């Protein structure tokens, strides 16, 4: 066992002395040491319950003959960090999560890991660490919250964001917004729709790194605690079997995850996180081209908020990710090994799809193509991403004049100041990994546009979007403006064309005009210090996952 490094031989007497002070008995030194990486915090609703799940994991580890050691890492709530400087730290925190899990596992020679994340950047950060460490690991995601109810309809947090714009447009009273605010999130856990946190939980299960049913098992259900306990038992078996993450997270497994992502119409942030996780494993090639290729083959089969009226609860009742995999079985790689020790085929052999109005059959999809599309052109030579499954049919192709802003904050002033007109293409630039720095999410602008009823306004940015964004919103434009990307050459009034079916994002400028404007472009100066200053120096481009270089 790897833990023998700290517990075997006369030279390890000091180590054993310290470990005994943690309560270990002589017998415990014969057992595998299992780390439980817990991202509990009481300021993040998606993580406030993880202490309880950690206890269930410990019960499982102990019952299977292991020794459980719990440690913590950080967690940021994107909803609370939204629309202020705090959002600059969100994507950057993914790297800190990965580094802290790696550091704890290596420093203490752990034999295996149970990873306990819930929200947006914590899930990929922990998976990056698992891939990097390559010791047996299993993930227990925290689970979605139940949907709220407002005036007889199901609602979630995105309805509150959009409600701000609706109030501004005079279509809702402040009292109604306050009522919506109180009932949209009926309890803690991850938001009720298919936003980034729940998308990443689904893809973790599709990768084979969580037990079947884990992603959609709601946090309030006893099933979630059972899965946590079973995961604790299973990790001890995985250590005995030497079943490592690189044996599970193969090229084919990542392709399965991308197919599930496209079928569900998941968050655009997956085009950052899936390549970033894969980058930790030698020999894998997971890039935007793969998303583009598969999006033309895999249909969008589940209309879940923000793209539709269904919630994660509906997906769970329809059979969850096992049912999605079953529906896609003619496309997916069924021989991939999973954390169960069995193949995908064995896991889904007896699965039945519960509600075909939630998980549609392949011959009757929501859309004929996958939920995400990769656009390229003279504005995005290295690519950009749009959640096409959440774009209205009449906005799949749009041409309009640019309204250019050098930050999210400038754009928000213009939106609420009534300076955005139907037909405009909003450009928010210098918000990329280096430009922000930190590649902030543009949920406030997109929600304000939707809430104010501006149905023919598009938005493009080198920043990101929340998984809750809907509409003709194109993000991750690469290269970013701060790195002399063409977005820096756009002026107010330039005609921009978005053609999602043709996968094009272009501005009506010649190559020479773009080059001349870039030479005279003045980049905003943004003074940052501490971690953000280091992140700005090291962050890579969005088209390769914005990983540190």
Swiss-Prot record:
Q: List the keywords (alphabetical).
A: 2Fe-2S, Amino-acid biosynthesis, Branched-chain amino acid biosynthesis, Iron, Iron-sulfur, Lyase, Magnesium, Metal-binding
Q: What's the domain of life for this entry?
A: Archaea
- Name the cofactor(s) required for activity, per the record: [2Fe-2S] cluster; Mg(2+)
Is Iron-sulfur a UniProt keyword of this protein? yes
Reactions accelerated catalytically: (2R)-2,3-dihydroxy-3-methylbutanoate = 3-methyl-2-oxobutanoate + H2O; (2R,3R)-2,3-dihydroxy-3-methylpentanoate = (S)-3-methyl-2-oxopentanoate + H2O
Binding-site list for Mg(2+) = 78, 120-121, 441
Its UniProt pathway annotation is: Amino-acid biosynthesis; L-isoleucine biosynthesis; L-isoleucine from 2-oxobutanoate: step 3/4; Amino-acid biosynthesis; L-valine biosynthesis; L-valine from pyruvate: step 3/4
Catalytic residues (UniProt): 466 (proton acceptor)
Annotated Gene Ontology cellular components are: cytosol
First-tier enzyme category under EC: lyase
* Its EC number(s): 4.2.1.9
Q: Which GO terms describe its biological process?
A: isoleucine biosynthetic process; L-valine biosynthetic process
Q: Which residues bind [2Fe-2S] cluster?
A: 119, 191
Bound cofactor: record note: Binds 1 [2Fe-2S] cluster per subunit. This cluster acts as a Lewis acid cofactor.
Q: N6-carboxylysine modification sites?
A: 121
Task: Quote one Gene Ontology molecular function term.
Answer: 2 iron, 2 sulfur cluster binding
Complex and partners: Homodimer.
Q: Give the NCBIfam families listed for this entry.
A: ilvD (TIGR00110), PRK00911.1 (NF002068)
Family, per entry: Belongs to the IlvD/Edd family.
Question: Per its database record, what is this protein's job?
Answer: Functions in the biosynthesis of branched-chain amino acids. Catalyzes the dehydration of (2R,3R)-2,3-dihydroxy-3-methylpentanoate (2,3-dihydroxy-3-methylvalerate) into 2-oxo-3-methylpentanoate (2-oxo-3-methylvalerate) and of (2R)-2,3-dihydroxy-3-methylbutanoate (2,3-dihydroxyisovalerate) into 2-oxo-3-methylbutanoate (2-oxoisovalerate), the penultimate precursor to L-isoleucine and L-valine, respectively.
Q: What is the name listed in the Swiss-Prot or TrEMBL entry for this protein?
A: Dihydroxy-acid dehydratase
